[in-house]
């Protein structure tokens, strides 16, 4: 048998049927070998290369970053001039500390582990290099509030056409709400009652996003729950 020929990189996102490798490599989970001896992916997922084995980690419901995406992250580590951020993705975000950049509010980078931030994806190479930025106005540390989550694929339904659903949630619960592309939602309601109602509304949106008349059902839920 021939030597190994890798056609993908470790942690690269692949689609079903995509060729992964040929030669002396062991097929692992969620891959198959075609008639020509090429190992291919069975699912949408991340390539995992370990020793002489290649497998796929499925990405059902996972957030795959795109340039200019708005994300809500949690500071997980501070190493030298880089702040590492969990963005609810197989990829960890890196926030370079701009110590000498002009027109940058350096106080924004005064962060600690556990802080919640609103950031934008500045660049992503599709494999391992995911760079975030908080330099623009409105980005940076989120003070107080609560973090809720939905499937990233449901984010457009939470926002609605021309932000109609998001506006309804804000107005009905009198809450500050920020919805990010990675499915994290930061809310700052006036009381725990509104928080609970928002959780119920988001769950309903997530479960019934495929059914018509969703806005009317959410409006009814908000009215009923908030009038109690």
Curated annotation (Swiss-Prot):
Taxonomically, which superkingdom?
Archaea
InterPro entries found in the cross-reference section: Exosome_RNA_bind1/RRP40/RRP4, KH_dom_type_1, KH_dom_type_1_sf, NA-bd_OB-fold, Rrp4, S1_domain
Under the heading SMART domains, the entry gives:
S1 (SM00316)
* One example of a Gene Ontology biological process annotation: poly(A)-dependent snoRNA 3'-end processing
Domain (S1 motif) spans: 68-135
Q: Name one GO molecular function term.
A: RNA binding
Q: Where in the cell is it found?
A: Cytoplasm
* Protein's UniProt keywords contain Lyase: no
According to the UniProt record, one GO cellular component term is: cytoplasm
Keywords, sorted A to Z: Cytoplasm, Exosome, RNA-binding
Please give the SUPFAM superfamilies that the UniProt record associates with this protein: Eukaryotic type KH-domain (KH-domain type I) (SSF54791), Nucleic acid-binding proteins (SSF50249), Ribosomal L27 protein-like (SSF110324)
Q: Which NCBIfam families match?
A: PRK04163.1-1
Q: Please give the PANTHER family that the UniProt record associates with this protein.
A: EXOSOME COMPLEX COMPONENT RRP4, PNAS-3 RELATED
Summarize the subunit comment: Component of the archaeal exosome complex. Forms a trimer of Rrp4 and/or Csl4 subunits. The trimer associates with a hexameric ring-like arrangement composed of 3 Rrp41-Rrp42 heterodimers.
Query: Family per UniProt?
Result: Belongs to the RRP4 family.
Stated role: Non-catalytic component of the exosome, which is a complex involved in RNA degradation. Increases the RNA binding and the efficiency of RNA degradation. Confers strong poly(A) specificity to the exosome.
Protein name in the entry: Exosome complex component Rrp4
Natural source organism: Korarchaeum cryptofilum (strain OPF8)
Q: Which gene encodes it?
A: rrp4
